[in-house]
Amino acid sequence: METHLGWARSLEAVLSDRSALDAFQEWLIEYSSPQYLDLFFAIRAYERMALEGKPEKSQLSKSIYSKFLSSRTGNCEAIPKHFRAPIGEKLRHGTELEDRVFSHCSNFVQEFLRRQHEEFVGSEEFIEAFNKMSSTTADQLPGGSAHHSSHQNTMRRSSGTTSRKSAAQIATQLTAEALLKSKHDRHSKLGETKLEKMYPPTRQPYVCNATTSHNDSAVSSTFSGDTPEAHRMHSNRLRHIRDEQARENHGTMTLPRVEKASVDGQQWDHSSESGRRNFAMEITRKLLRHIDKVKLNDEMEKRIDDIEECRYTTIDMVNGTEPNDDLGKIDEDEELDDYLKMKMTDDSQKGSTNRSPKGPAGEPNKSGEGSKNTTLSPTNRAPAQLHNTIRVPRRKDYPRDTSASLKSHRHHQIDTNRMMSQSMCAPSYSSASSSYSRDSFAPAPTTRVNFAPGSSKSSQFYDSSGIGSMAPSAFSATSSLDYKDRRQHRKAPTPKKHSKIGKNLSNLITISYLGTDKIPVVTHVPNDGPMTLAEFKRHFALPNGAHQLFFKTECEDGSAPFQLLLIKDEHHLLPVFEGRIAAELR
């Protein structure tokens, strides 16, 4: 019996037993490729002939190559080509083959047969062959004790018959007590006596494959229809059959699992080229697996960092989105040019103020100078020109976020400076022209250009001849200040800047409210100090007067975790509860 159990453990036990080998060969013919089994024994025969020094080994090697390994006539295509090609080259050149010339092919064939053996052990053919062999060995007994054993079997059979007769006689005596005792068995075992007659217990060992328990099965019982309740009822119905089988068959056993060679204990042959190559391939495979694992971990960490950096709310994105993206970005060269223009404007303003002539209330001018300055001297139409010159260009205002409101004083100061510079630059036409005449530079054009009132072209009339072209004008002052004001507009927060908020959560405070539908709305805003009710509503775009807001505060008497405080004043400071501002909308 122990020899038969070895069939399931290893391939060598099957190949060394004739009965198991015949069953294995029949299974290969039916379900797989039997030529690899023939090649295995042919290689063993060649190695034995080579060891004994028989001359027939050369003829056998040619037969093995032509029948199994040849690319044209061979039937073992699964063997790699680099194992078969050297053997064919040596046979074609008439070179004598070594004793271990088929060793690489033999190793490949053994691995193939081991995989087939694992499938063969789980087949019905293997179980039938195992039961057949077990029954024949159980019936075979030594010849000297045949008469004694037959006498013992006769005695056992007669004693068994008398015991069954006595049991039948006892069972026929029906009493009230016996019926009460057998009531449960009669109701739960209905029809089992007929089933026993149809399927009597066999006198052969019951062999099955090793499987897991019902609860640990890989197949779902609910999917297959075999629920635990149904399994329990089925077990109760057929329990007596299993008990009868166990009593009749004392040799019931479970087949052992297939033994697999451990990879950890594999020894590498570093003395041969193939052994070193296999060792290098194994090391490379492990290193590549480790590199892939490291790359995967790095990619996951990068994704987590990106998620942490992008932790900003929708309100921050809406407030930080710039409405006019056509203005472009300001690089360092533009900032340097702007600084030089402003510096030159300031210097030219100082120079033009020193060279400007006295007004009508000042000292009288000389006759020569007066004749030269009569063409561009301010007239009674100067107020109209001044009105056209200092006209502030209209610009569409876009909504800004809360950080822009903190700079309103600075914007007001910029607008005031713009008005003052425009008023100072209005009379620069006459002063500049007079200075040009005194310095003997190119004279200014004497033709007066009249533009319609309110036209923007009137502000662009300035002299562009000579070095004095850098003299200030309403157009240059207005354009430079307007350019600076656009830079202030572009300083509004953008989503890229808000993405850095997630790195420093200490600068944020969490505010939230619970709506009438019991859905919480949460956001994170910069912690700039105490917050008022108006700022809280502005963050969530809540309308005024629609609902009342109750804010969480610490309970005064300590009877509850918190209490709700109704706040109606828009300028009232909100309480902070557990590091956040929480409210309920009612």
Swiss-Prot record:
Keyword Isomerase in record: no
Subunit-structure text: Interacts (via N-terminus) with apr-1 (via C-terminus). Interacts with bar-1 (via ARM repeats), gsk-3, and mig-5.
Region (Required for interaction with apr-1): 1-135
Protein function: Works in parallel with axl-1 in negatively regulating bar-1 signaling in vulval precursor cells and Q neuroblasts. Inhibits Wnt signaling, which affects tissue specific expression of Hox genes, egl-5, lin-39 and mab-5. This in turn affects QR (postembryonic neuroblast) cell migration, vulval cell fate specification, and the development of sensory structures by the seam cell lineage. Has a role in alae V cell patterning, ray formation in the male tail and axon guidance. Does not affect B cell polarity.
Designated gene of the protein: pry-1
Pfam families in UniProt: DIX (PF00778), RGS (PF00615)
Predominant subcellular localization, coarse grouping: membrane
Name this polypeptide is given: Axin-like protein pry-1
Boundaries of every DIX domain copy: 505-586
Family matches, as SMART domains: RGS
Entry annotated with the keyword Cell membrane: yes
Comp. bias regions, Low complexity: 421-442
GO molecular function, one term: beta-catenin binding
Domain RGS: 10-131
Residue spans of biased composition, Polar residues class: 151-168, 368-388
Expression by tissue: Expressed in hypodermal cells (seam cells) V5 and V6, Q neuroblasts, ventral hypodermal cells P7/8 to P11/12, body wall muscle cells and neurons in the head, the tail and the ventral nerve cord.
